[in-house]
Amino acid sequence: MKRFHVHVAVADLAQSTRFYSAMFGASPSVQKDDYAKWMLDDPRLNFAISSRGNAAGVNHLGMQAGDGAELAGLHARLLDADSTVTAEKGGSCCYARSDKYWVTDPSGIVWESFHTLESIPTFGGNAARSAMPENTAKAACCG
């Protein structure tokens, strides 16, 4: 089952972690020095914050696929949207290795469709960023 994803760049990670923990009524499922993530079931949401953005605010939005078949379906929808889609296979970002597709909507909002393959011990970096349109690369997860 798919899960909505939001990644927000924050100015103060500790203060933001306390705020969102209280708001969601849950502690982060992943917490690092520069990153925190809540995997919520109600609402079905993957909400992440990090101190790695250029400015505080929404970094990107996305859809997390439950498996490779769901990701293929999301990819097909992105292609149907007549947008430039950038593939990132086995990308390392946000303490996870994932297969991803990046797209920018007509208003310049960056969207990520992804399937997480495994957790990794480092924040990582986007190998595909150099192939992305400039506005997408600037806002992508590891910006």
List PLM regions with ranges.
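Vicinal oxygen chelate
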Residues: 13-14, 62-110, 118-121, 143
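Short, charged/polar surface micro-motifs in flexible loops or helix N-caps
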Residues: 41-45, 54-56, 66-71
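Core segments of cupin and vicinal oxygen chelate
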Residues: 1-2, 7-46
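Short acidic/glycine-enriched loop/turn segments that link adjacent beta-strands
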Residues: 32-35, 55-57, 94-99
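A short linear hydrophobic-aromatic micro-motif
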Residues: 27, 46-48, 84-89
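Residue-level recognition of strand-loop junctions within catalytic nucleotide-signaling folds
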Residues: 11, 50-52, 66
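N-terminal beta-strand motif that seeds the catalytic metal site of vicinal oxygen chelate
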Residues: 1-14, 44, 60-61, 122-143
